[in-house]
């Protein structure tokens, strides 16, 4: 399968999963990976509860991104809220989606948060969701022992199909 050339927007879950599995370098060398400041901040919380391999070095993270982490305006967050006031997103996902919707270029979003997936269906953007498994496979990187289920292509497809039914739309 040919690797896409769009910007890859990642949430905190993806950053932590890549760090935990030694896949961050493969991801950032294979794609133009970007995120928002709130997701970077979330990677820095809870250090005392994480194993060493899950502790993200902020300078290394920021330095490996294709662009500096984006700050998101209150206006962009408000525009997102108006489109889906009943879907609760964590701060990182909310900022990531607000940023994504403000972009004029082509992008895909990688993040297994269920509310985020539901939002993608609600907004008619589920084709922009991509699994970590797909991204890593496309750059030829395999994770020893495999990825946890929420990072797989099958899991993503199943969840999106469920939300299409719940939202009454078409995938």
Task: Annotate each predicted stretch with a short phrase.
Residues 109-110:
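Conserved SAM-binding loop
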């Amino acid at each position: 399968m040919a690797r896409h050339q769009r910007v890859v927007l990642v949430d905190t879950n993806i950053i932590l999963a890549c760090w935990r599995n030694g896949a961050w370098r493969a991801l950032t060398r294979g794609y133009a990976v970007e995120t928002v400041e709130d997701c970077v901040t979330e990677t820095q919380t809870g250090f005392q509860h994480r194993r060493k391999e899950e502790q993200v070095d902020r300078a290394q993270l920021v330095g490996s991104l294709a662009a500096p982490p984006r700050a998101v305006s209150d206006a962009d967050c408000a525009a997102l809220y108006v489109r889906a006031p009943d879907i609760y997103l964590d701060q990182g996902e909310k900022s990531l989606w607000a940023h994504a919707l403000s972009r004029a270029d082509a992008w895909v979003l990688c993040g297994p948060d269920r509310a985020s997936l539901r939002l993608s269906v609600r907004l008619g953007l589920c084709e922009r969701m991509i699994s970590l498994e797909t991204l890593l496979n496309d750059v030829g990187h395999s994770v020893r022992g495999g990825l946890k289920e929420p990072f797989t292509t099958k899991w993503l497809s199943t969840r999106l199909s469920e939300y299409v039914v719940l939202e009454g739309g078409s995938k």
